[in-house]
Amino acid sequence: VTAGVYLLIRFNMILNENLCLFLLLISSLTMFMAGLGANFEFDLKKIIALSTLSQLGLMMSILSMGNYKLAFFHLLTHALFKALLFMCAGSIIHNLKDTQDIRFMGNLMVHMPLTCICMNISNLALCGMPFLAGFYSKDLILEVVSMGFVNIFIFLLFFISTGLTVCYSFRLCYYSITGDFNFYSLHSLNDEGWIMLKSMLSMLMFVIFSGSMLMWLIFPTPIMICLPMELKMLALFVSVVGAWIGYEVSKFTMSWVSNSLKFYSYSYFFGFMWFMPNISTFSMNYIPLMLSYNLFKSFDQGWNEYFGGQGMYESMKNNSMFIQFLQNNNMKIYLVLVILWVIMLFLILMI
């Protein structure tokens, strides 16, 4: 997924100013759109995939501002905690018999404690929890954006997208880890698959300690950014507000209202990434699919079958049944045939 970002990091010197401005706008909108769409999803894999798309938008946006080292730093830290998050999600989906809907989960902290610990810590790293892997890169990116010469639109997109990241992370934890177990009542979960657990616990160490280690390795001198107290605390404030909104949105009443008839169009618009599937997938696939369906219906299942396989089979079957009917030892048939032959012979003699 991140190969394109890595290539752009390697060839960052060929990006001109106009291309960087266009890239900044598109990547910021992608980051905001993916974060907003993840808050309306109930598929565990889709939530994590949209989270990856949002973080890719963050990398591309900071790369378009000229900070290629910072984009590479976030690429590495994001790879660590997102790999752990995908492993935890795969373990949970496997234990729930390939069920991906987070509404069927709940109270997994009791049934799968080690997996949930790894999932919680990777979620907190994704949110930018202080001193985890994601904190060092995300906080530095937000401070660089606060210090840079960007307009208020890009500035708000960065911080609102950060709040949305915390929002869907807490929503995911609320549905999957807390509450009641909503799967089959007689279904038992297993948290003793040590092949997965050894890998997850090893990745957990990297998620906790790799942020500071990579910062020491990538940047030769410590980066010190002086900002006013309001801007320094803005990232923390946005994260806290995003966590609170994620908790409120996860409640049943809010979820029911958002899917009601009054607000369904808004939920559809935000959940389907601003009608992106309708523009990119559905509209492009509609004409070829309808054309192939009509050809299949009219030709393959229509005239081709009538004059081809089914028609020949039907005519041969009818002829065989007629001949078999004639060959039955029936006195009436023999008398009728004799009369027909006599009439035909009489007609021939008259000619």
Please provide the spans of the model-predicted regions:
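Core, highly hydrophobic multi-pass alpha-helical transmembrane subunits of bioenergetic inner membranes
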Residues: V1-I351
